């Protein structure tokens, strides 16, 4: 009896999230499905909500997403490897590093905006460009990737490492050939969560200059916008037709997310092991 | 692992190469070309965007970008020389002017449209139709003890007053407090503030006894859910409509909207052409952006400023 | 493959330095330094204006004052209402994310079929990808009226709706990371427990969860950090009326909402009102640092290592 009750409780937990997701998606699709026309995806913003398009935003978000993955996975996993496999845990500076990363996860996204504005846009002289946006997002979600990767590395049974060392492998060989492939699923999860969050961020991007009106395709070192910023702009307009258009934009955003996630999920499923 | 790494690297290289296209300024033809950067108030942003959209049809080689860092943020960038145009829902403040001067940034101030601030109440509040400025002041001033509608006017029922309005960082807030309470920033603190006027609409329409204020277009687009209150600024009760704002009879809650232009940018033909376009077509643009066009006197002033700036 | 060195007798330490290894260690350390550079950058960006701010407003007033109204005339600068607002929302969010997240994780890891898991886990992760703006509006437009319908008297902007939605948003974080940790627990442990006569509930709660505790607690800490730092949801749904209360049914303002609203608004840069952002940001940073130090100590104590 207790068995069934326990299982029921667990299912209930799962359903809270699923039901909320379902309700959200239903509302968004209800408003937004009718908005999915060619103009939304290929056109640019307009003062007529029915003609408003989000092409520059879509392209920019995709580009930033890919750049983000390219930056955050090596740096995040590299940090995790350093902390787990190489660093002497007794040293104070390594402990500080650990705490530091946990702390960065709590910093509000807007503070990353301030940071980006001061150091990347102005300090490094990058200006208000797409690359700066991608870099800020990288810093924002780096803690998530590091923490998830660390846990993934920790979960690899030590016997694997010992066995490899016993066969004469160097530390890096152990990591690259044994530990990392084993930890790949966890790393993939962390990357998925990080990417998902970054793609939906608005506040820091506005602060470093994401535009609400741009009529040409964004380039790496040029003015840019982002889909969540465009959505936020549309939602804030008084004309309610813009809100409907925003719903369409949200569907597109979720679509992009799904595609980018698919890659990471594929990786995760392929390398999932059970010890 | 290997094939994975290779695929991802390839994808990334493709992205970077695609992204390293030319700069934003479109090419040639026999028209003008260039990039004009505008930033500032999120209220005025849609106006500049509407103007940019229409301008592109005339001059396809010119690209205009619009940001919404806020009036203050816009001026900060403007006075560092980072932008060509600054959108503003209030005139430039003295401290901001000083920074511009220090950095050697000369500019021209253009009036581009008018906006009204509508005072609205919950649809069920049928006892009130018009409020005087004095009454509004008593409701909104700092330390105000007005808690119920009855405190506003003894003939009103004893219904709790639920106040909504823009946050203290908004230009609308600055303007309202300046005109109603008499000092910018002077307001009671116990009201529901929000960044986003659509949220204020929700608040007022959802609470019986609700009272709030925001730009005219937010009332017009949500007419069915709100009740507009006439404001008596000394000349009788006037309703907030486009006509009254343009005629100047909806006082004191009519505000002008500005675009500031950097003088050095003005030397570029595309910038001058853009401003000229705005002034020539201001009625059409204001209409598209849900604002009120300039009065005849304001238009004359703007044209004068343009003549001066063009040199 | 084992490398064969010519004739050298077995030794505990390699007789020549492997430069490749040193280079790699250096590169990895460099990666780690990125996070250090970020923190340093944040501190630099925050400290200077914050120090300016504290020259004008005393730290004592700031920390103990009970009214936060810096942008009004005259201003008051007591940060406690903002702190209470953050606490109220975070508390609700964690109360949702932790139990439901962990429950979902246990189900996915110990009860669900592999195929079901393959579908459900990514579905949950979609929840993590919904823009926070959408969550904010959902809280305002759906959750608040729903709360009123079921009889809870909430203000139109309130911490409860924002906290509930934030909690649901964090469920994937807790669930996905906890579930990965549980998946990584060697099957040998499970089989051993079954062999000793345990049933599924026992195995799940007394063997797997304790074994995966490090990862599970890490997911909790991450969720708490995210909850404290979340901006958009609270900006839209929790309100911008700093109130000195922990009652989640009231309108509040969190530290993050204040920073976001003021940072993107019309306040002239360089003014004392603008500098409040940095003072509040610094407070947030210091407070979470303290929390994380405590949390890391706790995690270290509870971590179980198998093998």
Predicted features, each with a name:
Chain B
Residues 8-14:
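Hydrophobic helical h-region of N-terminal Sec-dependent signal peptides
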Residues 15-19:
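C-terminal motif of bacterial Sec signal peptides marking the signal peptidase cleavage site
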Residues 1-8:
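Bacterial N-terminal signal peptides that target proteins for export
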Residues 20-311:
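Flexible loop/hinge segments at secondary-structure junctions
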